[in-house]
A protein has these predicted regions:
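Protein-protein interaction/assembly regions in multi-subunit complexes
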Residues: 1-189, 194-235, 242, 247-276, ...
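Extended C-terminal regions of large enzymes
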Residues: 149, 156-160, 164-186, 192-615
C-alpha cells in the first residue's frame, strides 16, 4: 500500500512526540491529505473550540500519491479550525516538503496543546523530536529555513514554517515551505503561531517503496503524464506563462474584480499580465521573469521565478530583495493589483515577496487593502489613521501596507484582521468582499454565476480551488457552459467540489484536472494502494469528504445564512463587459444546490444522504 501506515502525534503542552498506526479504515474511506486529515480533526476537535486555544489541533497530512512518481505528487494539506472564518480550514501546498515527510516514513503529523515557549519539530526518518526555537522566533520564513539548514548541516532539509505574520496573529497567516510554496489560505499559519510552533524540519531517506503494484502503477503514471503533456493548458499554457496567463483572459470576459469589486474590468490588466513579465524593462534591460519552476514530481512547471528592478522605490535601499524570488502568479497579481487598481508590476512583486517572506496570504491581504482604499476614498479612513495616503491605484500605499502588516505595526495590525472585521469596525460591513470571513479570489461571481455559487457554499469560505468552475465556464473544460447563465450551475458546482476533494486527498495538484478526470487518477491510486479505487469510488469519497466538512461547520454554528455573497454582488450589476447589467442569481441557485447535494432546506445533510455516504 502507498500509505506509510503511521502518524506522529505531538503534544506541545507536554513536549512529547509519539508514533501511532494510521487508521486504515479511515484511510480507505477518506483517502489521505485533505480528506483523511479532516477526518482526524472532526473526530478529535470540538467544532465550537476557539481556533487559537490549546484545545484546537493542527494537522499536516499527505496523500497516497504524495512522494510517488505520479505527476505533481508532492502535495500536502494543513488542516485545522481556522481563525479567519471559524470554519474548517484545509490549506494545500506544493513544493517538496510533503514528499519529504512521506519519504521519512510518515503519513501525517498531528499537533495538539500549546507550547510554553517557541519550538520546532525535527524529523529525520524514524527519529522525531521537539527542539528549542528561541533563535527562530522573530525571523522571516526565508531566514528560518536558512538557519535550520545551516545549524543542522543539511542542505537537503525541507522546512515548513511561519514568519512574523504567524507570530503576530495576522488572521490569514500562511504556512510556507521551500521559500515560496504555501498553504496560504484561512489562517493555518496563525494557528501554528498561537501554539508557539515555528517550523517543522524534515529529512527523509526511505523513499516511498511500498507501492502495491509497481508495474501497474508505472504504466498508469506514464499514461497520465502523457495526458498532461498533450493538453493545451498543462502541456503548453501553464509551463510557458504560469497561472498569470489568466489576467487578460478574465479581463476580456469582464470578470476581473477591480477596485474592491466596484468594477469588473481593469484598464491596467495588460501591465500586470504574464505577457508583461517577459519583455526587457526599459530601465534595466532585464526581464522580470527569470525562469519557470516545478514542484516535486511535477511535469507542468507552472511556478515563476522573477527578479525586481533594483531601482524601484520599494527596494531601492533593500538589497535583500534584489535576488530572484517566487512569483508572480495570477491570484497574487490580481489581489495586489487589479483589486486595488494598482498597475505597477514592480510594486506587486515587492508586496508578493513580503507575503512570502513573512508568511501571509496575498489574496486576503490584497482584498483587505481594496476595502481600506474604498474606505479611504469615502473619507471614513484618513491618512492620520492609516499612516499613508491610500487612494485606489497607489503603489506606494500597497507596499507600505505590506510592510506594516508583516511587522504588525501601525494600521497593519488592523489590516491583519481581514476585511470582515476591519469593515465592521468602521461601520461598513458590506464593503468586505468575503464569504464566511474569507476574502474572494480573482473571479467576479456576478459575471461567472457558477463561481459565485461555489464561493457562497465553500466549506472554508470564499475559494476558487474548492470548485473551479472557471474551467467549464471560461475555458470550456471538460465542456463549455455559459458563464452568465445560472441554470445547471448547482449541479456543475457540486460535481467540481466533489471531484476536487478527491484530487486533493489523493495528493496531486488540482491543476492536473485541466487535463485529467478522476478516470486518470483512479488507476494510479488503485495500483499504489492495492485497493479498489474506481473513478466512481473516488467521486463518492470526494462527496463524503465535502459533507463531512459541512457537518463540522454546521456543528460550529454555521447556517444557511452563511451561504451568501456580499450585497454588492447581489444588487449592484456589472458595469461593463459581456456581463454588463448582471447580478448574482444566488437566491435562485442555492435551493437547487441543496437539492443536488441531498440536503434539507436549511443546508443540512439529510439522514438518507448521511447513510448513503457512510457518515
Amino acid at each position: 500500500m502507498s500509505w506509510a501506515g503511521k502518524i506522529l502525534r505531538v503534544n506541545l503542552s507536554a513536549g512529547t512526540v509519539t508514533s501511532e498506526p494510521l487508521n486504515m479504515e479511515w484511510a480507505k474511506a477518506y483517502l489521505g491529505s485533505r480528506g483523511l486529515g479532516s477526518k482526524y480533526l472532526v473526530e478529535e476537535v470540538d467544532p465550537k473550540v476557539d481556533p487559537l486555544s490549546a484545545d484546537n489541533k493542527i494537522i499536516w497530512a499527505t496523500g497516497p500519491l504524495t512522494g510517488t512518481m505520479a505527476s505533481t505528487g508532492g502535495r500536502y494539506t494543513v488542516i485545522t479550525k481556522g481563525p479567519l472564518t471559524g470554519a474548517i480550514a484545509c490549506s494545500n501546498s506544493g513544493g517538496y516538503w510533503g514528499a519529504e515527510l512521506k519519504m521519512a516514513g510518515w503519513d501525517m503529523v498531528i499537533f495538539e496543546g500549546q507550547s510554553a515557549k517557541p519550538v520546532y519539530l525535527y524529523i529525520n526518518d524514524d527519529v522525531a523530536e521537539l527542539r528549542d526555537a528561541g533563535h527562530l522566533w522573530g525571523q522571516s520564513v526565508w531566514r528560518t529555513e536558512e538557519i535550520l539548514k545551516s545549524s543542522l548541516q543539511d542542505p537537503l532539509l525541507r522546512v515548513s514554517s511561519i514568519g512574523k505574520a504567524g507570530e503576530n496573529g495576522v488572521l490569514y497567516a500562511a504556512v510556507v515551505n521551500d521559500l515560496h510554496r504555501a498553504a496560504g489560505r484561512s489562517g493555518v499559519g496563525t494557528v501554528m503561531g498561537s501554539k508557539n510552533l515555528t517550523a517543522i524540519a524534515v529529512r527523509g531517506t526511505q523513499g516511498v517503496g511500498n507501492v502495491q503494484n509497481p508495474k501497474a502503477f508505472m504504466a498508469a503514471a506514464k499514461a497520465a503524464k502523457k495526458v498532461l503533456a498533450d493538453n493545451a493548458v498543462t502541456g503548453q499554457g501553464l509551463p510557458a506563462y504560469g497561472t498569470q496567463v489568466l489576467m487578460n483572459v478574465i479581463n476580456e470576459v469582464g470578470a476581473l474584480p477591480t477596485r474592491n469589486h466596484r468594477d469588473v474590468q481593469f484598464e491596467g490588466a495588460k501591465d500586470i499580465s504574464a505577457e508583461a513579465m517577459v519583455p526587457p524593462r526599459a530601465t534595466a534591460g532585464k526581464k522580470h521573469l527569470v525562469t519557470n519552476q516545478a514542484c516535486f514530481g511535477c511535469t507542468i512547471a507552472c511556478g515563476r521565478i522573477s527578479k525586481m528592478d533594483e531601482g524601484h522605490f520599494s527596494v531601492k535601499n533593500k538589497p535583500e530583495y534584489w535576488g530572484a524570488s517566487g512569483g508572480l502568479e495570477y491570484e497574487a497579481a490580481w489581489a495586489l493589483g487589479a483589486a486595488n487598481g494598482v498597475k505597477d508590476l514592480e510594486a506587486l512583486q515587492y508586496a508578493n515577496m513580503v507575503c512570502n517572506e513573512e508568511g501571509f496570504d496575498p489574496i486576503s491581504f490584497g482584498a483587505t487593502i481594496g476595502a481600506v482604499m474604498e474606505l479611504y476614498e469615502m473619507g471614513v479612513l484618513t491618512k492620520e489613521q492609516i499612516g499613508v495616503e491610500a487612494p485606489f491605484g497607489s503603489a506606494e500605499a500597497l507596499c507600505e501596507f505590506a510592510d506594516m502588516t508583516a511587522k504588525g505595526i501601525g494600521f497593519g495590525k488592523e489590516i491583519g484582521l481581514g476585511s470582515k472585521r476591519l469593515t465592521a469596525k468602521y461601520g461598513h460591513p458590506d464593503l468586505s468582499m468575503s464569504v464566511k470571513g474569507q476574502e474572494f479570489p480573482a473571479y467576479d461571481g456576478r459575471v461567472i454565476q457558477g463561481i459565485g455559487l461555489a464561493y457562497a457554499t465553500s466549506n472554508r469560505g470564499a475559494c476558487h480551488l474548492r470548485g473551479y468552475t472557471i474551467a467549464s465556464e471560461v475555458l470550456g473544460i471538460p465542456v463549455k457552459t455559459e458563464p452568465t447563465e445560472h441554470e445547471g450551475k448547482p449541479e456543475l458546482v457540486k460535481a467540481f467540489q466533489d471531484a476536487t476533494a478527491a484530487f486533493d486527498s489523493a495528493g496531486v495538484c488540482i491543476f492536473t484536472s485541466f487535463a485529467w478526470t478522476l478516470a486518470d487518477v483512479a488507476p494510479q491510486v488503485q495500483a499504489a494502494c492495492g485497493e479498489e479505487f474506481t473513478m466512481e469510488h473516488l467521486n463518492h469519497i470526494g462527496e463524503r469528504i465535502w459533507n463531512m466538512e459541512r457537518e463540522f461547520n454546521n456543528a460550529a454554528g454555521f447556517t444557511k445564512a452563511d451561504d451568501s455573497l456580499p450585497k454588492r454582488l447581489l444588487t449592484e450589476a456589472a458595469k461593463t463587459g459581456p456581463g454588463k447589467g448582471i447580478v448574482s442569481k444566488l437566491p435562485e441557485m442555492l435551493p437547487k444546490y441543496y437539492d443536488a447535494r441531498g440536503w434539507d432546506s436549511e443546508g443540512r445533510p439529510t439522514s438518507v444522504t448521511r447513510e448513503r455516504l457512510g457518515l
